[in-house]
């Protein structure tokens, strides 16, 4: 069932990619658009995940990933900018490293740190939002997740899928 759903999404997105205008940037209010790789701008920052496209649409939650990153910009719009960016990079982490929540979080934190916009204060803000939003069935509880984010922030070097098992 999951495979069939992913294949359906993949084929629909391929069709949309063929008809999409690759020169168009997405604004935070453009729901239902497939954004070509390298063209997504969220809260003033251009975000990329290699050759992965982003589908901006309304759905339950903030973001999911499969063959594309799906973002609910409407649900994210009131979050602090660093939280919005980290959500995107978390989903990019799933594209790159698979289903591990910890590996996706670690990838997001390290990429944000390398880009220079994630510091201790921004990390505290992100943890505060996670504590309010809860964690759902897939993510570690907020306190454990923030501890893992801090460990990834402090750790030097690259991310591997073995960094986390969740």
Language-model segment annotations:
Residues 21-65:
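Auxiliary, metal-adjacent structural segments of Zn-dependent hydrolase domains
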Residues 1-8:
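Bacterial N-terminal signal peptides that target proteins for export
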Residues 117-166:
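Long, well-structured alpha-helical subdomains associated
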Residues 99-115:
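An active-site-proximal "capping" alpha-helix that borders the catalytic cofactor pocket
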Residues 8-16:
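Bacterial N-terminal signal peptides
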Residues 52-81, 92-95:
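Active-site scaffold of zinc-dependent metalloenzymes
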Residues 86-95, 105:
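Active-site recognition of the HExxH zinc-binding catalytic motif
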Residues 78-83, 98-102, 140:
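Soluble non-cytosolic domains of exported or imported proteins
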């Amino acid at each position: 069932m999951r495979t069939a759903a992913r294949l359906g999404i993949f084929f629909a997105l391929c069709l949309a990619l063929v008809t999409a205008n690759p020169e168009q940037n997405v604004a935070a209010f453009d729901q239902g658009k497939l954004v070509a790789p390298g063209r997504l701008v969220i809260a003033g920052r251009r975000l990329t995940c290699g050759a992965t496209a982003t589908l901006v649409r309304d759905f339950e939650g903030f973001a999911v990933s499969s063959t594309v990153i799906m973002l609910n910009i409407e649900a994210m719009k009131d979050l602090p900018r660093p939280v919005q960016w980290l959500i995107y990079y978390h989903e990019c982490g799933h594209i790159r490293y698979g289903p591990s929540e910890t590996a996706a979080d670690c990838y997001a934190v390290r990429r944000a740190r390398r880009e220079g916009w994630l510091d201790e204060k921004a990390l505290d803000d992100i943890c505060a939002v996670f504590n309010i939003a809860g964690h759902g069935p897939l993510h570690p509880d907020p306190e454990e997740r923030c501890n893992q984010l801090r460990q990834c922030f402090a750790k030097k070097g690259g991310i591997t899928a073995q960094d986390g098992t969740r």
